[in-house]
Design a protein with these regions (language model features):
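Conserved Ser/Thr-centered positions that define the repeating blades of beta-propeller domains
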Residues: 428-434
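Hydrophobic h-region of N-terminal signal peptides that target proteins for export
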Residues: 10-19
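Exposed low-complexity, polar/acidic, P/S/T/G-rich flexible segments that act as propeptides
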Residues: 413-416, 462-466, 473-537
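Secondary-structure boundary elements
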Residues: 148-239
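Short beta-strands within extracellular/lumenal beta-sheet-rich domains
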Residues: 382-412, 449-452, 524-533
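Extracellular polysaccharide-degrading/modifying enzymes targeting complex plant/algal/animal polysaccharides
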Residues: 21-131
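Hydrophobic/aromatic-rich core segments of domains that either
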Residues: 211, 249-317
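Alpha-helical and coiled-coil interaction segments, frequently adjacent to or embedded
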Residues: 281, 294-388
Length: 537
């Protein structure tokens, strides 16, 4: 619901060489009411006492303990009638009483005092907040620019979407957008070139790699078991999370690429990495954000820690809050520890090829789909995003086969076009390797035809980054036509540039997908930043 509408157009001079014209940024804003809905996930609901249940929340809205909650709890589509109830009343009487107590905790009962985890109803905590919707559009017609988006607020802001459009009608491009000061996340070589400096010692290199993993990932159930998340570029850009073994193996992969010997220890309950230099091994644990120095000053190895666990137990807890006595036992129970030194592939590249007319959308608020082949009964990660790539497929022949490749894990793919009864329907088939094509049915939904590839993708049981699409048309229906393709993919929000409350300086580099120089008449790309700023009373 829009309360007022304002449009502000202004020019910002980017940090370019003086000979270049100023970069134009169009900024619009409007005031609206934002509806915030958080569905209570059964895996985050716990029985408390009597009829009371607690639910973990992540939307960050103020609760009654520190103010007055403006949230309403819905059971299916009906609001429960008794908010801000006493906890004793929720426990003893129930019948839909609830209390949004803190930003992270809801106390509630169901309308009939049934178990919300098993009664097959949907519980949603809903609120409305006045916000300012901001949109900044940047048109770029040169291969490298730096520009600044001045959010101009001290409040927390919510990034909605980042959109990148290739507006050129004939040139495929590879854009690389980052925040000024970020490492190059597009390849493992780029990561190392960003975090390693000339003249670094082997220990300094090891520490830089360890610190990079500490900063750019978090601990959560991985998408797959195995090497899918053991490529540093996939680990950081696609997922951003994993277990201790995933962090350790990515440490080892980067260390190997940096010219260091590395290996991984399994401690039967934990996994850590080691690098070899100065005639000995040294342990680095990015998952627990720790390493340990000996009295002699060097970083201890796993075997040294097993022999001298007091290096671990000097503090009661480690940097992430784990009991150091329990951690020490993992090292000292040497009979079930094992070590492995092997080369891990680190070849994935974030090569975002945008064909003419392509639109790439990172939706920071969309968490509908996720890739995971294991731990399906466990909570979803606290941070992940869904994006879309929209591409217009140009059909000119009776039969055409095209490869669809994308550096983010593909969650869904679909084609949709207007239904014309007189026109013969094309046939669609897909394949992983260009052989053994499997036909995908065409369905009609109202005035459009739809081809959905999601089930085929899911049936493969692993992360997919490419597939071949074959389209066959009746000769009578041949001739040039366009059919839109939409890919849904998963991305790690931490690794995608976003507007910050204090403002952000962005760096954009664009190169031609064919490796040649961009044409002199290149029409450029458009970058759109969308974010919201809360209006406080």
């Amino acid at each position: 619901m829009t309360l007022r509408l304002e449009l502000i157009i202004f020019l910002i001079t980017a940090a370019l060489c003086p000979a270049e014209p100023p970069l134009q940024i169009e900024h619009g804003e409007r005031t609206s009411l934002r509806r915030v809905e958080e569905v209570l996930r059964p895996d985050r609901i716990r029985h408390e006492i009597g009829y009371a249940y607690t639910a973990g929340l992540s939307a960050g809205r103020i609760g009654d303990k520190h103010g007055r909650s403006e949230c309403t709890l819905f059971e299916d589509r009906k609001p429960l009638p008794l908010p801000r109830a006493l906890h004793a009343s929720i426990r003893k009487v129930g019948k839909g009483r609830y209390s949004h107590w803190t930003s992270g905790t809801l106390y509630f009962s169901t309308s009939d005092n049934s178990d919300p985890r098993t009664n097959k109803r949907r519980y949603t905590l809903v609120s409305e907040q006045a916000v300012i919707d901001h949109v900044s559009r940047v048109r770029v017609d040169r291969p490298a620019v730096t520009y600044r988006i001045p959010a101009g607020t001290n409040q927390s802001i919510t990034n909605r979407r980042l959109i990148i459009r290739n507006t050129d009608p004939s040139t495929a491009v590879i854009p690389r957008l980052s925040i000024e000061g970020w490492p190059d996340l597009s390849s493992s070589e780029g990561i190392l070139a960003s975090i390693l400096k000339p003249g670094m010692t082997a220990e300094e290199k090891s520490l830089a790699i360890w610190k990079f993993l500490v900063d750019w990932r978090f601990h959560h159930y991985p998408a797959e078991q195995g090497d899918e998340v053991h490529d540093p570029v996939r680990f950081i850009n696609v997922y951003g999370y994993g277990f201790c073994d995933d962090s350790a193996r990515n440490t080892a992969a980067l260390a190997q690429l940096a010219g260091l010997r590395s290996r991984v220890w399994g401690l039967s309950g934990h996994v850590v990495a080691e690098t070899y230099y100065a005639g000995r091994w040294h342990m680095f644990d990015p998952d627990h954000e720790v390493y340990y120095r000996t009295p002699a000053g060097h970083i201890a190895s796993v075997e040294e820690l097993a022999a001298n666990p007091s290096l671990i137990t000097q503090t009661k807890t480690d940097p992430i809050g784990s009991d150091t006595r329990a951690i020490a036992r993992l090292y000292t129970t040497t009979e079930d520890n094992s070590v492995r030194e092997r080369k891990v592939s680190a070849t994935h590249k974030m090569r975002l090829v945008l064909h003419p007319g392509d639109e790439l959308v990172y939706d920071f608020q969309n968490h509908d789909k996720i890739h995971r082949t294991t731990f399906n009964d466990r909570p979803l990660p606290p941070s992940f995003g869904n994006g879309t790539l929209t591409r217009s497929l140009s059909l000119t022949d009776h039969e055409c086969t095209m490869s669809i490749e994308w550096p983010y894990v593909i969650l869904d793919a679909s084609l949709q076009w207007p239904a014309h009864d007189a026109e013969p329907l094309p046939k669609f088939a897909v394949s992983l390797e260009g052989t053994n094509f499997e036909e995908i049915p065409v369905t009609r939904q109202g005035q459009v035809y739809v081809v959905r590839i999601a089930e085929w993708l899911k049936s493969k049981g692993k992360a997919l980054y490419r597939f071949d699409l074959q389209i066959t048309r009746d000769s009578a229906g041949s001739g040039r036509r366009q059919i839109p393709l939409k890919l849904d993919f998963q991305f790690a929000p931490r690794a995608v540039p976003r507007v910050q409350a204090t403002g952000s300086s962005f760096q954009l580099k664009v190169e031609s997908a064919n490796g040649r120089a961009l044409p002199a008449d290149w029409d450029g790309v458009e970058i759109v930043h969308e974010w919201q700023e809360p209006i406080t009373p």
